[in-house]
């Protein structure tokens, strides 16, 4: 459990500005392929409230239960909060390359939701922020996804990966984009969850 001092919102909370804290929540969140895969694999647990009973490799993934529970809470809150979850062509290319037809169709359905939400927006001009050499520690694939998140004016980039969030502070400082795991986003939402239940 986070205390106010440990919370990512501690600056705002300490100033007694709950409205400012609420307004600072990421509302347009890019879903990377690792997050999409977990949403697909554990859809029953996340969307239907089924018990989390991982098998095989998933049973050995440290912290997976917490991340799946965080996704469940995020999407429960989103039933009323109406945050935007962004899926783009770069994500879709990665998914199609996995050659899993049912998963691919599911991601197309998620993409359709985003296309409806973003209807009327002009497609962004592709940026080149992540081409800069000081982002060299980020993989080419992650750089493409992060760039699309920036291009679509996302507030946050959600990933289940462990490596990319280690660069979160640097990425946010350089670009304003917040890279976070589901548990991090859930911690940001926690003070406001009752507004949406």
What are these regions (language model features)?
Residues 31, 36-100:
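PIN/NYN-family metal-dependent endoribonuclease catalytic core
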Residues 26-29:
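Residues that mark the start of a beta-strand
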Residues 97, 104-107:
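Short, contiguous, well-structured surface segments enriched in hydrophobic/aromatic residues
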Residues 141:
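Acidic donor-binding loop at a coil-to-helix junction in glycosyltransferase catalytic cores
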Residues 6-8, 61-64, 132-138:
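Short, flexible loop segments at the rims of nucleotide/cofactor-binding pockets, characterized by
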Residues 90, 94, 109-136:
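Acidic catalytic patch
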Residues 2-22, 43-53, 135, 146, ...:
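Acidic, PIN/NYN-like endoribonuclease modules and their adjacent C-terminal/linker elements
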Residues 35, 91, 144-145, 163-164:
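Alpha-helix capping/helix-boundary segments
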